[in-house]
Amino acid sequence: MSSKAVVFAYHDIGCAGIEALLNTGYDIAAVFTHADDPKENNFYGSVAQLCARNGIPVHAPEDANHPLWIERIAKLNPDYLFSFYYRNLLSEPLLATARKGAFNLHGSLLPKYRGRAPANWVLVNGETETGVTLHRMVKRADAGAILAQQKVIIERSDTGLTLHAKLRDAASNLLRDALPQLAQGKLAETAQDESQATYFGRRTAADGKLEWKKPAEELFNLVRAVTQPYPGAFCAVGEHKLVVWQADVVKGNEGLAPGRVISVNPLRIACGEDSLVIKFGQRNDNGLYLAGPSLANELGLVDGSVLRGAESGRKPRRTRVLILGVNGFIGNHLSERLLRDDRYEVYGLDIGSDAIERLRSHPNFHYVEGDISIHTEWIEYHIKKCDVVLPLVAIATPIEYTRNPLRVFELDFEENLKLVRYCVKYNKRVIFPSTSEVYGMCQDQYFDEDTSNLVVGPVNKQRWIYSVSKQLLDRVIWAYGAKGLNFTLFRPFNWMGPRLDRLDSARIGSSRAITQLILNLVEGTPIRLFDGGEQKRCFTDIADGIEALARIIDNDNDACNGQIINIGNPENEASIRQLGEELLRQFEAHPLRGNFPPFAGFRDVESKAFYGTGYQDVAHRKPSIENAKRLLNWEPTVEMSETIGNTLDFFLREAMLEIADKK
């Protein structure tokens, strides 16, 4: 009996995959594809037309991972799911509908070049070989065990189009041999070597910009990677756009500055190393396809002309980052990190400046004292002026959720919604701080941004107003994203470090847990452990968290656009009791220990005695950080003991200043 398959496919390689299944005797129960985008240059074969000609049911749902589609696919009872250049990630519940497994054909030699547009990326990077890989699909994109691979040699004359044709042929050959063996259970699987994995994001037309300060070889590779039918490599010439379709490298640059025209026949441009001959191109997106000398004439170029983008002695404009809540824990550390990089200029607003005094003399740091609920004109102007917006203003301490729930809603939701709408109005990128609290009482072992349920308690437990305010904003931002808003949501998991809070905040109960514990040590009062202190959290060093956030701002290859990213350290899981015990150990060994009273012990306390009846806690909160690894190439590195030590030292020195002031 033939094996039954459900197929997810698009593009020429999608057609090749379907044809291979038909030729090797598989029964295709249904095919899922994408509707063609009229804005794309559709140079490839149509999966929908192929299915129509072969009488195969074909669908193009907006979301194949929707429970209704998963239910329909499950009723087909497929032996296998196959993905051939389908553009969307398939969820674990969908993958589980296949009795014998789900498999993807990827256009590279995994684990190299995971992600989007691998055929273009290998050309951009000057690789001499690539290939195709048949691998098992798992939760993480392109990370499953490998069943078969076939290499493809990349010639210097290859372009994105010719390489794609080679990959299509390689896919047909690989599937012709592998599919019968798969049906017979004869294909062995080999786990990918994660240490060799590389990931590349999607490419956009803007990535084709020619930067003449780079070596000519790099520009040559860019040209052939994005030449027709792709949008092309380009630069500016006066008020016009020069699109380069074919080029070659010539040794030497005659000692001229990058971007200067060495000659117009041939049209030869000096680069940072060697020079690039433009063989064919056009003026603007709607111009005629011309040879280099004719193109130079049309653009008015002469020997010695300078193409825009050449080094002119003027640095490119810094990226302007607006941080609302700049004096807060994340805001002040992030500002410090960005100011170490000359590419950024930071504009900040907050109601105080004690944590950023060290930054105020920096020439690229601009601070205004103000309140987001009052200084609306200043905020709207600066959102319009800046490139990236981080609205970090929020009430984020549990005691306030129960004693001031309306204030939490007004600030955390209503005021922040205004900021989001300004970003929509002026088409600005917003990086919004969601929270690990949105997962609520989720029962998953690891909280996943894309699949975990967000579970909160009853209405009379007011502690959830912070969680649902943030969650609702997440959903609003996601909806605006569907209409064009460029956003990233990041979810911090228990970040700790210097300048986390103030001891005075702990004195009124409005602080994070570690600050409260340190205050108990400093004042010689018992450390209160609510409900036994058995609640587990994953504590993340502020340096690790800020590095991840800086990479989100950098946004290499636009990988973070429209993404939700947990930022936490699952290896640093500990209960609040264990946190207190480690604090005590380091406190007793600290050089300043002699300035403080004796330890008063641990005391178990009911949480409602402190937080009130509106409080409800969660037993654990552990993040999945696969998105952060994949999108940011980031992993946390700081152990919890080091984070605790740095945080403790900061607060003990603050306490010493208080003691000195009293004297």
Swiss-Prot record:
The pathway noted for it is: Nucleotide-sugar biosynthesis; UDP-4-deoxy-4-formamido-beta-L-arabinose biosynthesis; UDP-4-deoxy-4-formamido-beta-L-arabinose from UDP-alpha-D-glucuronate: step 1/3; Nucleotide-sugar biosynthesis; UDP-4-deoxy-4-formamido-beta-L-arabinose biosynthesis; UDP-4-deoxy-4-formamido-beta-L-arabinose from UDP-alpha-D-glucuronate: step 3/3; Bacterial outer membrane biogenesis; lipopolysaccharide biosynthesis
Q: Cite the CDD domains for this sequence.
A: Arna_FMT_C (cd08702), Arna_like_SDR_e (cd05257)
Q: Where, in this chain's numbering, is (6R)-10-formyltetrahydrofolate bound?
A: 116, 138-142
Cysteine pairs forming cystine bridges in this chain are none
Annotated UDP-alpha-D-glucuronate binding sites: 396, 401, 435-436, 463, 494, 528-537, 615
Keyword terms, alphabetized: Antibiotic resistance, Lipid A biosynthesis, Lipid biosynthesis, Lipid metabolism, Lipopolysaccharide biosynthesis, Multifunctional enzyme, NAD, Oxidoreductase, Transferase
InterPro entries cross-referenced by the UniProt entry: Arna-like_SDR_e, Bifun_polymyxin_resist_ArnA, Epimerase_deHydtase, Formyl_trans_C, Formyl_transf_N, Formyl_transf_N_sf, Formyl_transferase-like_C_sf, Lipid_A_modif_metabolic_enz
| Stored Pfam families | Epimerase (PF01370), Formyl_trans_C (PF02911), Formyl_trans_N (PF00551)
The catalytic activity, as recorded, is: UDP-alpha-D-glucuronate + NAD(+) = UDP-beta-L-threo-pentopyranos-4-ulose + CO2 + NADH; UDP-4-amino-4-deoxy-beta-L-arabinose + (6R)-10-formyltetrahydrofolate = UDP-4-deoxy-4-formamido-beta-L-arabinose + (6S)-5,6,7,8-tetrahydrofolate + H(+)
Give the span(s) annotated as Formyltransferase ArnAFT. 1-307
Which residues are annotated as active site? 106, 437, 621
Query: Which chain positions carry the site (Transition state stabilizer)?
Result: 104
Residues that hold NAD(+) according to the record: 350, 371-372
Q: Name one GO biological process term.
A: lipid A biosynthetic process
In its UniProt record, a GO molecular function of this protein is: carboxy-lyase activity
So what does this one do?
A: Bifunctional enzyme that catalyzes the oxidative decarboxylation of UDP-glucuronic acid (UDP-GlcUA) to UDP-4-keto-arabinose (UDP-Ara4O) and the addition of a formyl group to UDP-4-amino-4-deoxy-L-arabinose (UDP-L-Ara4N) to form UDP-L-4-formamido-arabinose (UDP-L-Ara4FN). The modified arabinose is attached to lipid A and is required for resistance to polymyxin and cationic antimicrobial peptides.
| Family in the record | In the N-terminal section; belongs to the Fmt family. UDP-L-Ara4N formyltransferase subfamily. In the C-terminal section; belongs to the NAD(P)-dependent epimerase/dehydratase family. UDP-glucuronic acid decarboxylase subfamily.
Q: Per its UniProt record, what HAMAP family does this chain match?
A: ArnA (MF_01166)
- What's this protein's name? Bifunctional polymyxin resistance protein ArnA
Q: Which organism is it from?
A: Pseudomonas fluorescens (strain SBW25)
